[in-house]
Regions:
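Glycine- and acidic residue-enriched flexible segments with recurrent GG/GxG motifs
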Residues: 1-286
Length: 286
């Protein structure tokens, strides 16, 4: 039997992130392989995850949920399709010169002593595009941990952290299809940070610990779907609209009588790739 006590997201055959109802297995989850959407079978996450970013999609200067933009601008792009198939992508444009990462930030609850992964979706606009995506944790005054990603070479440019703020564990960029890339940055939070930043840069790293980025006043980057979660990997997208939100753990229960006996030499085969944070069956009951 299968159970999950919440909605969850998966990617369909068109490359659109869609919602799946509570208790419904995420069958037919697709992954972009660089040229086509491939059916990976069942997307199964046996660990609950919480997106700690209160507003994962609303970067508007009207609502001001995200921090002030004193040296950059941001605007929704009604003609751009975001990864969920809607039009909630924003264009972030840093002004000319060095930009502190106190731009486009939101407060999150990330107690020290834990591992956190920050992720977001980025895309280069059709013109005047920034090549570099930026993710950062900080205290909003230059004390932080930053990762910069190259959207042209599809690689991690650089990571940096204040030596007492965090330890860098990992950084990755994944092709999410339709020109979008999901970038993620994992740290061990040591002390003193409580905001996350999502942005872009004209250069792969600027200033001590890569804590600053740079703009030219005209080039921008499309952003969508900010997510910060406890854990050492990014999980499936969890949208938020005012407060943190949780995707429940998925549980597979296999009756012992239905598990093949080793003496029969009948293998248990998994078709497709499961996204497992805790591999293996959660429950084995009679």
């Amino acid at each position: 039997t299968y159970s999950r006590a919440s909605q969850a997201r998966m990617t369909n055959s068109s490359g659109v992130i869609v919602s799946v109802g509570s208790g419904v297995p995420r069958l037919g989850h697709h992954v972009w392989n660089g040229s086509a959407w491939v059916n990976e079978g069942l997307l199964h996450e046996s660990e609950a995850r919480t997106n700690l970013v209160p507003h994962s999609e609303d970067f508007s200067t009207t609502t001001n949920f995200w921090g002030p933009l004193t040296t950059s601008t941001i605007a929704i792009q009604p003609t751009v399709t975001d990864p969920t198939g809607t039009n909630n992508a924003y264009l972030y444009t840093p002004q000319n010169g060095g930009i502190g990462h106190q731009q486009n930030y939101e407060n999150v609850s990330i107690p020290s002593g834990n591992t956190y992964t920050l992720s977001a979706y980025f895309k280069k606009p059709s013109s005047n595009a920034l090549n570099h995506a930026v993710l950062a944790f900080s205290n909003n005054s230059g004390y932080g941990a930053v990762a910069v990603f190259n959207l042209s070479t599809i690689s991690v440019d650089t990571t940096g952290t204040h030596p007492t703020a965090a330890a860098v564990l990992d950084a990755n960029i994944t092709d999410a299809g339709n020109g979008w890339y999901r970038c993620s940055y994992t740290i061990n939070h040591m002390a003193g940070m409580w905001v996350v930043h999502v942005g872009g840069s004209t250069v792969p790293g600027y200033g001590a610990y890569s804590r600053n980025t740079a703009g030219d006043g005209t080039s921008g980057i499309l952003i969508f779907g900010a997510q910060c979660e406890a854990g050492n990997t990014p999980s499936s997208y969890i949208p938020t609209a005012g407060s943190a939100a949780t995707r429940a753990a998925e549980i597979l229960t296999v009756a012992a009588a239905k598990v093949p006996n080793a003496g029969t030499k009948t293998p248990i085969e998994v078709s497709g790739t499961e996204m497992l944070t805790n591999p293996g069956f959660d429950t084995d009951t009679d």
